[in-house]
């Protein structure tokens, strides 16, 4: 099985940075306890406090698929439009072998 790497680019509405951070803090332990989660880490743009990048690494596509339909992710997805400036941009990355 090949690992799945995601870069998720997120922009929140002005004044909603704290809501994004609270959501991440709540979700992080739940996501990291999921089978196949290898990394789930949020970074903020140093120049724009409303922009974030979430780095995810999954052991397999099946693990990511299960994550996407987990109860906590479905609940989070329902709330995202209340504080995000638009849909997240998800980039699926392949590892480069040297």
Predicted regions and their residues:
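An amphipathic, aromatic/His-enriched active-site/gating alpha helix that lines ligand/cofactor pockets
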Residues: 26-39, 57-91
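Short, flexible segments with low predicted structural confidence
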Residues: 2-4, 19, 35-37
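Short flexible/disordered coil segments
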Residues: 8, 70-71, 96-98
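Short, well-ordered beta-strand segments in beta-rich or mixed alpha/beta enzyme
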Residues: 4-11, 41-68
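Glycine-rich beta-strand-turn "strand-cap" elements at beta-sheet edges
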Residues: 2-4, 41-50, 76-98
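Short, surface-exposed ligand-recognition loops at beta-strand->loop->(often short) alpha-helix junctions
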Residues: 11-20
